[in-house]
UniProtKB/Swiss-Prot annotation:
CDD domains: Pep_deformylase (cd00487). This is Peptide deformylase. It comes from Chlorobium luteolum (strain DSM 273 / BCRC 81028 / 2530) (Pelodictyon luteolum). Fe cation binds at C94, H136, H140. Removes the formyl group from the N-terminal Met of newly synthesized proteins. Requires at least a dipeptide for an efficient rate of reaction. N-terminal L-methionine is a prerequisite for activity but the enzyme has broad specificity at other positions. Its cofactor is Fe(2+).
Amino acid sequence: MILPINTYSDEVLHQKAKPLKGVDADISSLIDSMFESMENASGIGLAAPQVGCSIRLLVLDVSCMKSYEDVPPMVVINPNVLAVRGKNLMEEGCLSVPGVQGDVLRPSEITLKYRDRNFQEHTEEFSGMLARVLQHEIDHLNGTLFVDRMEKRDRRRIQQELDDIAAGLVPADYPIARECSRGGEGPACM
């Protein structure tokens, strides 16, 4: 099922998400819907708060990118960044901030502890675009958007666009939610 994407001003995007204690049928269904929603919106990553569920869950699929064709789609639950290395400035965008891009400085490599769809624990190192996408999506789980990480002068430059998104004036090629009625607590989110 394609889920609507919450946007910039929606409260659920500015809250720290709650950890998951396991994967049941509802969470498994949510994961499937998140992948479907991400693909429908031509995204490469999607965090549960973006679909109105304040839980520490994200999905990503970077296989559409030339250097990452062999990287399988990932489900990341309860991620914890253990170490970071290097720095890289790169332009980012976000399904929750449609039509806006901006430069964000992030570590170029991370060591990540997380659980997969089967709730099996992993500790892995990631670099390049995969590290960036993971950090971007993990930020969503911590109530942070990429625009919050932009330099202040760059943020001021896009403020009108952010105001337009908050006012519901920016169209997208995918379903957009107005403030999530579930508040991140509905049955699909548990």
